[in-house]
Every structure is written in C-alpha cells, then in structure tokens.
Amino acid sequence: MAAKVKKGDKVVVLTGRDKGRTGEVIQVMPKENRALVRGVNLVKRHQRQTQTQEGGIISKEAAIDLSNLAVADPKDGKPTRVGFRILEDGRKVRFAKRSGDLIDG
C-alpha cells in the first residue's frame, strides 16, 4: 500500500493529549504503523551521563500511531484525507481531498 504520510509532511494530531497540534514528520515506521512528529507527544527520559552527553532529564518525541495523524491541507492547514492521482507525465502524486491541491509534486 502506498504511504499516505511521509517524512517531511506537515501533520495534525487528531486525538490524544496533543490534539489539534501540528508538526513535521521526522520519521515514519511503516512496520509498526507509527511516526515521530517534531514537537508532538513529548515524553521525559532520564539520560545517563556519558563522555559526549550531559546527564539529566531530557524531553524527546515518542512515536504516535498513524491513525491519530492527518496530513495538513497545503491551502489552509486543516486536516485532510489523502488521495492519489496519476499525472499526464505518468507520475503518481498525493493530493488533499479537502481542497484538491497536490501535496507532493
């Protein structure tokens, strides 16, 4: 199945503690059906001190399920569903079903 959410996409969180927040996808994990989004779903982790890194409590992004994310419409930034379209030159591109604008390409 084609990927509806890709690295670098602007997404909106649909449910959970960070509902309504937007961020950029840092990493997609298709086997786990999860993604890392910059600035969303932050958790505190205790880090042991090493020669290169300082110890202490740090905040980092935790993975969030893809079903809780929606791609942001390029036109107005609101959540939209994603469709696929084949252009005249044969490329398969994603488009926002809300506005019809192309997401990539």
From Swiss-Prot:
GO terms for biological process: translation. The keyword rRNA-binding applies. GO terms for molecular function: rRNA binding; structural constituent of ribosome. Keywords: Ribonucleoprotein, Ribosomal protein, RNA-binding, rRNA-binding. Part of the 50S ribosomal subunit. One of two assembly initiator proteins, it binds directly to the 5'-end of the 23S rRNA, where it nucleates assembly of the 50S subunit. NCBIfam families: rplX_bact. This is Large ribosomal subunit protein uL24. It comes from Methylobacterium sp. (strain 4-46). The lineage of its organism: Bacteria, Pseudomonadati, Pseudomonadota, Alphaproteobacteria, Hyphomicrobiales.
